[in-house]
Amino acid sequence: MDESSLLRRRGLQKELSLPRRGRGCRSGNRKSLVVGTPSPTLSRPLSPLSVPTAGSSPLDSPRNFSAASALNFPFARRADGRRWSLASLPSSGYGTNTPSSTLSSSSSSRERLHQLPFQPTPDELHFLSKHFRSSENVLDEEGGRSPRLRPRSRSLSPGRATGTFDNEIVMMNHVYRERFPKATAQMEGRLQEFLTAYAPGARLALADGVLGFIHHQIVELARDCLAKSGENLVTSRYFLEMQEKLERLLQDAHERSDSEEVSFIVQLVRKLLIIISRPARLLECLEFDPEEFYHLLEAAEGHAREGQGIKTDLPQYIIGQLGLAKDPLEEMVPLSHLEEEQPPAPESPESRALVGQSRRKPCESDFETIKLISNGAYGAVYLVRHRDTRQRFAIKKINKQNLILRNQIQQVFVERDILTFAENPFVVSMFCSFETRRHLCMVMEYVEGGDCATLLKNMGPLPVDMARLYFAETVLALEYLHNYGIVHRDLKPDNLLITSLGHIKLTDFGLSKIGLMSMATNLYEGHIEKDAREFIDKQVCGTPEYIAPEVIFRQGYGKPVDWWAMGVVLYEFLVGCVPFFGDTPEELFGQVVSDEIMWPEGDEALPADAQDLITRLLRQSPLDRLGTGGTHEVKQHPFFLALDWAGLLRHKAEFVPQLEAEDDTSYFDTRSERYRHLGSEDDETNDEESSTEIPQFSSCSHRFSKVYSSSEFLAVQPTPTFAERSFSEDREEGWERSEVDYGRRLSADIRLRSWTSSGSSCQSSSSQPERGPSPSLLNTISLDTMPKFAFSSEDEGVGPGPAGPKRPVFILGEPDPPPAATPVMPKPSSLSADTAALSHARLRSNSIGARHSTPRPLDAGRGRRLGGPRDPAPEKSRASSSGGSGGGSGGRVPKSASVSALSLIITADDGSGGPLMSPLSPRSLSSNPSSRDSSPSRDPSPVCGSLRPPIVIHSSGKKYGFSLRAIRVYMGDSDVYTVHHVVWSVEDGSPAQEAGLRAGDLITHINGESVLGLVHMDVVELLLKSGNKISLRTTALENTSIKVGPARKNVAKGRMARRSKRSRRRETQDRRKSLFKKISKQTSVLHTSRSFSSGLHHSLSSSESLPGSPTHSLSPSPTTPCRSPAPDVPADTTASPPSASPSSSSPASPAAAGHTRPSSLHGLAAKLGPPRPKTGRRKSTSSIPPSPLACPPISAPPPRSPSPLPGHPPAPARSPRLRRGQSADKLGTGERLDGEAGRRTRGPEAELVVMRRLHLSERRDSFKKQEAVQEVSFDEPQEEATGLPTSVPQIAVEGEEAVPVALGPTGRD
């Protein structure tokens, strides 16, 4: 090699080597790789070259450099010479115009390519090839290793490094802003104009809820991009994820909405993509990493050569694989042509009619109101039924004037958008919305089981497993919402609804905020603090006990406020009361921001993992709070160690609501005493104050469109689906048809509930077609027209009876009576052994799981008058908590095998007909399988078999001549039982014997009202009201599925399945009359000295004589009855029956008084004082309840009563957790008048916790939403004030010994 070549080579080595420590960066003249004139612009800045490491590999990149020197930019000085142009490179950044292809992708824009010679010699090419490809270091002329640290490009693209450092992002943005200042300023200016023009508050809201939510997200993405650009945090990876989010939102808009407003969303997405397109391309070029590219290129080359056998034209193949050979116009033209010029597909008249009807906006006339579910500050929630599909919904009516005067129109649109967009099994779904003259209405799915607040009110603290399940399902709902940027802001037990299967659904998004959806590129340093202060409000919003400290301080808040509320909710689940309370908002907020949490001790102490979870959720600082970093922090807590998060819906819940009928709303508290909203639309309204946004509120979600169109389609299609028609429809239409015409005249204007028939097995499941069911569910829906009375025959039951036909038998009118088999009426002394042992035997059902239908008894002469007026007695008739043939609108809604026990056996010759009750009522359209069950273990109606014609007994005024007795019927092998009544004896020659009453028969109806499951006093009350004529329906025990088993060894563990005693009112009845009825019935207390010409002597118990007792009044209770399973009580306890109303003043319901909810502004209420009289207030035009924060504090709060803990008897429980989970029913039956002997000594701390749990009055709702009304709860000392006897009611034939009634766990059982 000649001397000149050697000198040139050494000089090249010097130029390529990096400076040593302490030496400044050398920057020479930059020469262009593009042939052309010198550029007058600034030279491109170089990479920061800091912290050189001796002996490093040439393949290393300066990734891990010091943070202190991160911003030291050794820019090249301005110098003469040529520059290479970025515009000459493809967007991938690997193409150059150098003569040597070996250098084409070796260096990126970050390399010192300006120091390379323009025309290298072969020796130089050999050296450069070795230099860039070899892993060996090259000795420079000074003996050092060269290079020590190669100035590679720092790529921020995914997959290159394990993490991305903020200083790298900031450094890259400095380079980007320095090099392309106009691109950055142009993007930020356009983003600001975009936000100004398209923000939700700057234009009318979209009419479609899904599109409204997507609009919110697009605007939030643009706002986040503008903020990150100002903070120098944008990267090519961020733009890539932003593009993916926009495409995902656009896909949701096309799939989930049929509105014409989709074009607006498409236009919005295109504008935003155009705004960010140029910065995204520039950053992609700047962040190009040749090392990563070479690895990918080698892998692709090996795959191409080995796998596909490509030998020639490899560069062209790579270009094709990278998509660089495609013409973008070829893909854009067909799309535009498809959108603009594609002719509409031909449609048939039927399809056009379906589309027109499905797209028709819903209105109030499409629904018929069944009853009130609950009241709130802004409006009320009603149970309604769609007139065409016959499906049940819950409709939320919000007063428009309240919203306008409070300037919260935008907030109700946010609630509508969230409910419409959300698709999660743990979030309530909305189907449509519309406006009336006075209200904004949102139609949502009906969740039957009430809310967790009512459950806590009736049950007290929940068992740990039950609380864990509820909490975990709420965590999944919260995870879904937070991923879409939704902050609920009002999490509390009141907003956690319980489905018929015992699972949780989150509802009430009236205070929610929509923020930015989760993005992976937001995981940078400082993002947690920014997200924790995403929103700032000028006033405190939420429910006081659940408001986080940062909201109280008005420091800004975000998703961590929901985790604070979750900690309060879990504490309330396990302890029974909230951890913070006070008489005034100031006192309450003072405890929230300063007080420590008080924990129960002793037997009631919480598990260590649960206490740790609550403590970490209730951290004062939102940055330290569990869940702030993501939902995975909560899900990985040891409290959920053994929990299967993926199978929560398959988990069997401990509490499964027992519904009596499809319109049963007894699990909800109507709160009629606190709020009153007029349901009429005829009241005067101020139309001048109407908002221009309100007409946009009417919308129809894709769920409702699919259901409506499917009902229209299935109504005209022949289908073998087994269906029946509701009695309310019969009552409305009022037409008559013959049996022949009824099977032929099937028209599309009749929409019926769906059934799936397989022999006599009737199953149904979730009616949402887009959600996949579990293996045990049938995802079918049919709304075809079928006869009004349909029952399945017995072909798989356990009980006796001939096997019926496999096809359903439709019975219209009164069929022939069953074959006469007149039994011999035994004398009282000659009862069978089985009947005589009923009081001490355990009766159980072994037919759990069989699917049978419930007959509805028809009176004689009503056979063909299907649509005529109904009798008063069946109007009040109800199905029992364990089943039975119910009147009214049908039998009870079935429960799982663990809850319901008795199976109804319908023989082929049964002479009565009735509607079938489906496990999934198609009138209750659920968005997912968690709302209703369709497992084969669901019993449609579990009591008796064939019912005889009613036995009418006429008395001469002396007596009826028979006695009855209450028996326990246990449900399967469980400890849950229901009370049934049998005819114990019939006197010879008495009116009862002459009418055909037989001893040993099971009484199912008295005067047309079902008595299955009623306590004994209720049955006695029905008899005493009958006068000289009584109508009984009975059935033989051998015709039922009740089996006689061995006597129970421990009757104290029995749990009675209660049912509320209430009568049904007509839909057109004025609700105001119920109050006067209730007062009139309370004054007519039954007297113990009169027999009402029945000869049945009756002793009243304390709870029956109380005016507030539900056993006294037949009117429905305004509050939710206690429906939870009863706890364990001693066997020798003589007690009055528990009150079915938690708000009753009966001392038999300590849970009602003890486990009360915190009141709105007064944390502790007086327990013994009378309720405060409500002062009259002038009716305002807007009917707006005042904000609790605006109310002045009470000068003299009511005194706190001593702890009622000594009043609780020592009840044996299997564990401390179960002891806390005792319900009001069992606590009532276990109450003693001499409860002083059963007191337990406790420390002052434990008594304080118990006092806080037992003395909190009814809970409050949101500060903005609800007014403060104090409600007084009652305590045990009233028991002594009543002065009423607590003896067990007895019924006996005149002149004979009274027979004790099995009302509870007594010694006679």
Curated annotation (Swiss-Prot):
List of catalytic residues: 490 (proton acceptor)
Biased composition regions of type Polar residues, renumbered to the chain: 88-99
Protein kinase domain mapped to chain residues: 367-640
Compartments (UniProt record): Cytoplasm
PANTHER family: MICROTUBULE-ASSOCIATED SERINE_THREONINE-PROTEIN KINASE 3 (PTHR24356:SF140), SERINE/THREONINE-PROTEIN KINASE (PTHR24356)
Sequence ranges assigned to domain AGC-kinase C-terminal in this UniProt record: 641-712
Name the record gives this protein: Microtubule-associated serine/threonine-protein kinase 3
Illness the protein is tied to: Developmental and epileptic encephalopathy 108: A form of epileptic encephalopathy, a heterogeneous group of early-onset epilepsies characterized by refractory seizures, neurodevelopmental impairment, and poor prognosis. Development is normal prior to seizure onset, after which cognitive and motor delays become apparent. DEE108 is an autosomal dominant form characterized by the onset of multiple types of seizures in the first 2 years of life.
Gene Ontology terms for molecular function: ATP binding; magnesium ion binding; protein serine kinase activity; protein serine/threonine kinase activity
Ranges annotated as biased composition (Basic and acidic residues): 1228-1245
Gene3D superfamilies: 2.30.42.10, MAST3 pre-PK domain-like (1.20.1480.20), Phosphorylase Kinase, domain 1 (3.30.200.20), Transferase(Phosphotransferase) domain 1 (1.10.510.10)
EC number: 2.7.11.1
Reported effect, residue 655 to L: Found in a patient with autism spectrum disorder without history of seizures; uncertain significance
Catalytic activity: L-seryl-[protein] + ATP = O-phospho-L-seryl-[protein] + ADP + H(+); L-threonyl-[protein] + ATP = O-phospho-L-threonyl-[protein] + ADP + H(+)
Pfam families: DUF1908 (PF08926), PDZ_6 (PF17820), Pkinase (PF00069)
Keywords, alphabetical: ATP-binding, Cytoplasm, Disease variant, Epilepsy, Intellectual disability, Kinase, Magnesium, Nucleotide-binding, Phosphoprotein, Serine/threonine-protein kinase, Transferase
Cofactor or coenzyme needed: Mg(2+)
Sequence ranges of Pro residues compositional bias: 1185-1213
